[in-house]
Amino acid sequence: MPKIVGTGNYTYEVNEEWAQLPEGWDMPAASVFGDSQDRVFCFNRSPDHHIVIFDREGNYLHHWDAGSFTFAHAIFIDHEGMVWLIDRDIGQVFKYTPEGQLLLTIGTRDYQSDTGIAEISSSLAHTVVRPGEPFN
């Protein structure tokens, strides 16, 4: 019997064989997000390929590296298709094009906020807000 995760209208069947990686690659995915073109972006804790992109069937399309991350934490793709990444340990949020060009960095590397929010990386929803389900 397949493993089902999620609740309500948002349930998914787990497929351990879905991602078709290039030979010899490891992909310790920290966060996954799908875009409007049915591509799946995986933000990984690998020093060699931070962002790996697949089609909806799990076929590898391409990848890009996103600088120097210490702890990949979250990915979000906004309504314009821009890719937002959070590194939990360095306390920064980054905005990239879908092709991997850095557009914006929020926060100072290795400096945690003293505003009462424990980490800038606590939630990507604090950074990017859009109307829609299921999260905002």
Residue ranges and their predicted role:
Residues M1-N136:
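Eukaryotic scaffold repeat domains enriched in small/polar residues
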